[in-house]
Design a protein with these regions (language model features):
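A generic structural micro-environment signature
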Residues: 23, 28, 33, 87, ...
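Generic structural motif
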Residues: 9, 37-39, 43, 82-86, ...
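Mixed-charge, glycine-accented linear interaction segment located at domain edges/termini
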Residues: 120-155
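Charge-rich, low-complexity N-terminal segments
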Residues: 1-60
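Acidic-enriched, low-complexity/disordered segments with a strong bias for Aspartate over Glutamate
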Residues: 11, 20-23, 41, 57, ...
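General N-terminal targeting signals
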Residues: 34, 39, 44, 49, ...
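Surface-exposed, low-hydrophobicity interaction/linker segments
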Residues: 49-115
Length: 155
């Protein structure tokens, strides 16, 4: 797990809320503190679909929550890799990794005090593979953000 400060709020907010940069990620949860608090559980509530909704499907709704003359007091958004991307990512880290031991790779995005921070996260059930997965996810996260021209500095 590693934490970064996003160095350009405007550019990052544009990529998060206006562009499709994160649309393939799944929403785990989001909480927006505007004049009121709005919590979004990223799981489907209908019986037809299961799992988590994609960020692309709720991005517009979330943008409406923060839009206005004043910045929101704070918000946090937790995005995770889809099952397909999780399997592919784990294979790129180490072909011998057992995917059943890793239930998620996450981005924790927080906006607070007019600043964005990003923290990587993993959900790993096997202590022996935890370090390998954590370090690789940190590297892959940095590579992804740099490929999207999102400037970061490590905290």
């Amino acid at each position: 797990m590693i934490a970064y400060k996003i160095t350009s709020n405007k550019d990052f907010a544009g990529q998060l809320f206006k562009a499709d940069t994160f649309d393939r990620f799944l929403l785990s949860e989001a909480v927006f503190n505007v004049p009121y608090t709005v919590s979004i559980d990223g799981t489907f509530s209908s019986g037809e679909e299961t799992g988590n909704v994609s960020w692309g499907d709720v991005r517009g709704i979330c943008m409406q929550l923060i839009k206005g003359k004043e910045l929101p007091k704070s918000f946090h958004i937790v995005l995770k890799l889809s099952e397909e991307n999780l399997s592919r990512t784990l294979a790129s880290i180490d072909n011998n990794l057992d995917p059943s031991k890793v239930s998620g790779l996450f981005f924790n995005i927080r906006f607070e005090e007019d600043s964005f921070t990003l923290t990587t996260g993993t959900a790993v059930s096997d202590f022996q593979v935890m370090r390998t997965v954590n370090e690789a996810w940190d590297r892959l996260t940095l590579r992804f953000f740099r490929s999207k021209d999102i400037a970061l500095e490590e905290l």
